[in-house]
Amino acid sequence: MSAQPLARAFRQIGGMTAVSRVLGFVRDVVFAALLGAGPAADAFLVALKLPNMFRRLTAEGAMSNAFVPAFARARREDGEAAAMALAGETQTTLTMVLVALVILGETFMPAVIGLLAPGFADTPDRMNAAITLARVTFPYLPMISLVAFWAAIANADGRFMTAAAMPVIFNILLVGGAFLIPVASGWLAVEKAMPLAAALLMAGLLQMAVMARLLRRTCLMPAWRWPRFAAPVRAMWRQFSVASAGAIALQVNLIVDLSLIHI
């Protein structure tokens, strides 16, 4: 990448990151003012942690680090069709894994919340609220994972602006959902925080729609392909396995930290 496109990419990513950080601060202030401290806040924050933990593994970091070099190499050495075939197989495999993970998570959510926040067992209302909210927010995981996967394809093509705007969409939708909290101010904890959980899913759907539109417009949207695990695909997943080791260790540490906080 020459100096001029590199500078433009830096401005785009840096600008969107700065806007996202400001909106993230606004989001936290609005949460504190409208949701406050209590069972609703505790339950929602634990529910929000769950998809974010898995996202580090399936969306950011390990997956991107493994896929982007493989996609760029296939594009350079074997042509556009081979690169898009790799992307299509990876997309299908990733989606199948994520759907299975969501099904398992939804089924065993009480045990998962008991692991993340063992102290909630002493207050059944808080535990039940966290379980319900986590079941609502957990489907955000495949949404944001596919968004990050599509963003990696766009980035490999030198298109950074839309991908960098994804956190901005997330924060705007969450702030909007927070302003619905006063409507539920007299409700139970789970119902009081439900506007935020719904806003999270809306953010995921909007992020998917925006990224999908970009890829379709630029003819970069991968087709769904049944995985055949050819040599480039196997090499990519081997790289993912290596890269995920560090991410898994980090997430285990975060789970331990979160469990200690909520003892």
Task: List PLM regions with ranges.
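Membrane-embedded alpha-helical bundles of multi-pass transporters/translocases
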Residues: 1-261
